[in-house]
Regions:
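Structural motif
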Residues: 19, 96-98
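Glycine- and other small-residue-rich loops at beta-strand/loop junctions that grip anionic moieties
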Residues: 72, 96, 129
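Asp-based, Mg2+/Mn2+-dependent phosphohydrolase catalytic module
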Residues: 80, 84-88, 100-237
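A general marker of short, structured functional hotspots
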Residues: 54-57, 95, 134, 151
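A structural preference for short, hydrophobic beta-strand core positions in alpha/beta folds
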Residues: 13, 95, 216-218
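N-terminal helical cap/lid subdomain that shapes the substrate entry/recognition surface
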Residues: 1-80, 84-89, 105
């Protein structure tokens, strides 16, 4: 949002959220592909936006991001406890992200200091593509010596996450509360009328299921029960 505002072509939070989960440079390309944004850029600069404009906005995005990245590393409520419970079952935790390795070199130590640590983190660097392609999941499998995708569960809060899991042929679970797709901070969730909140949650659930999710949960605290159900299904097969 800030990188586009800097050139007088503002994008909305909703437009930005619609492309979350992709690599950051792909998010910027997607924003330039929005008809309104494309038209506003041409009106302001008298020419169509090109790849040099994508790279310029990406450079500005990185400048703004690195200045504040460490401030946005607080774990979502329930994440630390759930990961601990899953590890107690022998489950390994691999992460995929739209951030670059240099960005994650800032995020991971700060998150670890707050109790959130993964066994492996894969970024799009050096891979054919980021989300929704499955390569980061496959790289996690190789790094963690996971022999079969049947043993993999992809959990995420964006449509790109869901598509990544489905493209990898992995069990795929979407989360609603705190998600990019819901787009509400905890304070906003608490202040919304119950019927409006339920309607918004239902819309996110519908979109995630339409994208292929096998399960959609309200919070990560429900994940161990989902895994137990999947394990029962696998025992029957």
């Amino acid at each position: 949002v800030e990188s586009f505002r800097a050139i007088g072509v503002p994008v909305t939070a909703a437009e930005t959220r619609a492309h979350m989960g992709l690599t950051k440079v792909e998010e910027i390309r997607a924003l330039f592909d929005i008809e309104r944004v494309r038209a506003e850029f041409e009106r302001k600069f008298g020419r169509p936006a090109g790849e040099e404009d994508v790279q310029a906005r990406y450079a500005e995005f990185q400048r703004v991001l690195f200045a504040s990245l460490e401030d946005y590393t607080d774990p979502i409520p329930g994440v630390v406890e759930t990961i601990s419970a899953l590890r107690a079952q022998g489950i390994r935790i691999g992460s995929t992200t739209g951030y670059t390795r240099s960005m994650m070199d800032v995020v991971l130590p700060a998150a670890t200091a707050k109790g959130y640590a993964v066994d492996n983190c894969v970024t799009p660097d050096g891979l054919p593509a980021g989300r929704p392609a499955p390569y980061m999941i496959y790289k996690n499998m190789a790094d963690l010596a996971i022999p079969s995708v049947d043993c993999v569960l992809k959990y995420g809060d964006t449509i790109a996450d869901i598509k990544e899991g489905i493209n990898a042929k992995a069990w795929t679970v979407g989360v609603v509360l705190g998600s990019n797709e819901l787009g509400l901070a905890q304070e906003e969730v608490s202040s919304l009328p119950a019927d409006e909140l339920e309607a918004r949650k239902a819309d996110v659930r519908r979109r995630m299921l339409a994208a292929g999710a096998h399960y959609v949960v309200d919070t990560i605290a429900e994940l161990p029960a989902v895994i137990a159900e999947i394990n029962r299904k696998l025992e029957i097969l």
